[in-house]
Regions:
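Non-catalytic DNA-binding core/recognition domains of DNA-processing enzymes
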Residues: 1-3, 97
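Proline-centered turn/helix-capping motifs that create local helix->coil transitions or kinks
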Residues: 3-11, 110-116
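Conserved tyrosine-mediated DNA breakage-rejoining catalytic core shared by Y-recombinases
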Residues: 16, 71-108
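Active-site/catalytic core of tyrosine-dependent DNA strand-transfer enzymes
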Residues: 35, 98-157
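Short, contiguous acidic/charged loop-to-helix segments that flank catalytic cores in large enzymes
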Residues: 43-45, 83-96, 130-139, 157-161
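Short, basic (Lys/Arg/His-rich) helix/loop patches that form interaction surfaces
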Residues: 44-46, 144-174
């Protein structure tokens, strides 16, 4: 406005090279040794064991996002392959289920009701619209709380969320 009104001179590229975004100071990926300790910890608490199983599966499924993991349906696993569409983008995905993942997959999915379309016990599958979204956000918050509990039990002091699993997988691939 000041330039348009003649109160200030126009200076081309005045802010060239100036970063105007928000810089993230916190690393989202976990170091491999801490990730390994979360994946291999001996746990008595059944809820933390399920959280660890989900963490391991999400990592083995190529750093799968929690939203995709929670929305997997029983029909998405066929012939040793996990086939689904990303929730965020609709991109079709094919992931071979490794032999190391089957036991965790069976155990985690054993808590799902027979009438539920979902592979894992995070969502019930009976809500629609805003209620379905509320159910998902509640499941995500619950999972993240359990990840933090798991980290505390394992002596991991770095902040962790479901996104940390995805980011850790990507960083290890680099």
């Amino acid at each position: 406005m000041a330039v348009e009104e003649g109160l200030a001179p126009y200076i081309p590229y005045l802010f060239k090279g100036v970063f105007t975004g928000i810089e993230s100071k916190r690393k989202k990926a976990l170091p491999q040794d801490l990730l390994r300790s979360l994946m291999t910890a001996s746990l008595d608490d059944p809820e933390l064991r399920k959280t660890r199983q989900a963490l391991c599966l999400m990592f083995q499924f190529c750093g799968m996002a929690f939203v995709d993991f929670a929305h997997l349906k029983k029909e998405n696993v066929r012939g040793g392959v996990l086939e689904y569409k990303r929730q965020k983008t609709g991109t079709p995905m094919l992931i071979e289920v490794q032999s190391t993942a089957w036991e965790s997959l069976r155990e985690l999915s054993s808590d799902v009701g027979k009438d539920s379309p979902y592979l894992f016990p995070f969502l019930k599958g009976i809500k629609v619209g805003k209620e379905a979204y509320k159910e998902y956000t509640s499941a995500l918050a619950h999972f993240n709380r359990n990840l933090k509990r798991l980290a505390r039990v394992c002596g991991v002091s770095i902040p962790i969320t479901s996104y940390s699993i995805r980011h850790s997988f990507a960083m290890i691939l680099k």
